[in-house]
Each structure stands twice: as structure tokens, then as C-alpha cells.
């Protein structure tokens, strides 16, 4: 099953390349119980034994993989994804942090940003 999934993904990537009308950066976001690119060295969330991010880069795409909490809420994952893309101090917001008794701005969670110019004029593709 894993080989079929990877093969289908790669086939769709190759065949749709000629149909693509843009080269917006691709942001890969793992799901529930997932992991980031550097968190498990032997297996990639996006590709298993293969490396989908590296493959897409090899054919000319700009690709980034964000790492969010594996059991975090949708809200927390969205905030973490936003700051990893845009950059800045991770900030869950005062109301959310107070409501769930969590740190609003976790120490050491400052991101350079994969694509700080993300905006209406500079869109991205989010794949999750």
C-alpha cells in the first residue's frame, strides 16, 4: 500500500507539473500523531522511506515542512503553522492561553519564517 501511495503521488506530481499555472511555495503540514522533518531520522512523515520534500525540490518546487504538536488542537496547529511560515514569536493569544491554562508565548519558540512574504499577493499551497 505504501509503495502504491507514493507511486500515485509521484505520478500525479509529474503529470500535473505541465498543467500547473504557478510555482507557489508548497508547505507540508503533518496531521494527528505526525512528526516534523527533523524529529524522526529514519522515516519521513511525507514519504516514509522516500523523501517527498526532497523529490519535489529536485524537480524545481520550493517546499517546506512545518512541525506542529502531534496531539495539539486544530487551533494550536494553525497558530504554529502560521508562525513557522511567516516568522516571529509564537503567540497563541491571551484569551486562548488563559482559557486552556497554557503559556501564551512559549520561550524559545521564535521562528525565522520559511516564507515571510506570504500574503494575498504571494500565495502558498498548504498540503496537510
Which residue stretches match the model-derived regions?
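N-terminal non-catalytic accessory region
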Residues: 19-127
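N-terminal signal peptide c-region/cleavage motif recognized by signal peptidases
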Residues: 15-16
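Sec-dependent signal peptide recognition
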Residues: 2-8
Amino acid at each position: 500500500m505504501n509503495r502504491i501511495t507514493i507511486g500515485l503521488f509521484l505520478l500525479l506530481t509529474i503529470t500535473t507539473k505541465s498543467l500547473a499555472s504557478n510555482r507557489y511555495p508548497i508547505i507540508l503540514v503533518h496531521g494527528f500523531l505526525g512528526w516534523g522533518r527533523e524529529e524522526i531520522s529514519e522515516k519521513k512523515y511525507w514519504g516514509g522511506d522516500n523523501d517527498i520534500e526532497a523529490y519535489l525540490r529536485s524537480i524545481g518546487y520550493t517546499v517546506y515542512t512545518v512541525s506542529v504538536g502531534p496531539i495539539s488542537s486544530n487551533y494550536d496547529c494553525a497558530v504554529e503553522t502560521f508562525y513557522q511560515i511567516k516568522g516571529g514569536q509564537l503567540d497563541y493569544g491571551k484569551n486562548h492561553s488563559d482559557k486552556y491554562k497554557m503559556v501564551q508565548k512559549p520561550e524559545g519558540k521564535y521562528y525565522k519564517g520559511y516564507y515571510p512574504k506570504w500574503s494575498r499577493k504571494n500565495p502558498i499551497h498548504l498540503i496537510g
